[in-house]
Amino acid sequence: GMLTGVKLDGGLYPLSGFDGETIAHGLDSLDEKLQKYSKMGIDFAKWRVAFEINKEKGTPSDAAIEANLRILAQYAKACQKYGIVPIVEPEVVYSGNHTIKQCREITEKILKSLFKELEIFKVDLAGTILKTGMVLAGSENEIQSSSREVARETVEVLKRSVPKELAG
């Protein structure tokens, strides 16, 4: 059969005091949305946060990472309370001139931090899905990653960062 899902984040907005960084909105209405969607029989929900790598600006900042991942963890816990499978999406944005090494370091930092937050909020990882991107150089970098490099770096980051208990 087919499963139904819904996007629950309210979009990305500028993170006050952090030039060029964003934060996801929507926690304020999450509970009532989950009540409604639970009654409708929704199976899963997705929430996206995004991080831009910019070495000159120092992004993503620790503050932006922490704030966004805490929101993802709160969302995931709330979904599970209503029997809805949460899909967590901490996206590292492809645009920019970052190297594959910078992407690897940032992606690994974000994923490790995400799973710490999910643990703090007692999110059941067996009932959670991670939507992640590939580890690769930014679209504006002169040296683009080969498919072999992308595969190797992505798999290594996932092995080092993602607990075995995660569902998907």
Residues of each region from the PLM?
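Catalytic-face loop-and-helix region of soluble metabolic enzyme cores
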Residues: K122-V123, G133-G168
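Short glycine/threonine-rich loop-to-helix capping motif typified by GTGT followed
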Residues: T59-P60, N97-T107, L136-V150
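Conserved, mostly hydrophobic/aromatic
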Residues: W47, V88, L130
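Glycine-rich anion/phosphate-binding loops
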Residues: D19-Q35, P60-Y75, K109
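Glycine-rich, proline-tolerant flexible connector loops at the mouths of alpha/beta enzymes
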Residues: G17-F18, V49-A63, V92-H98, S139
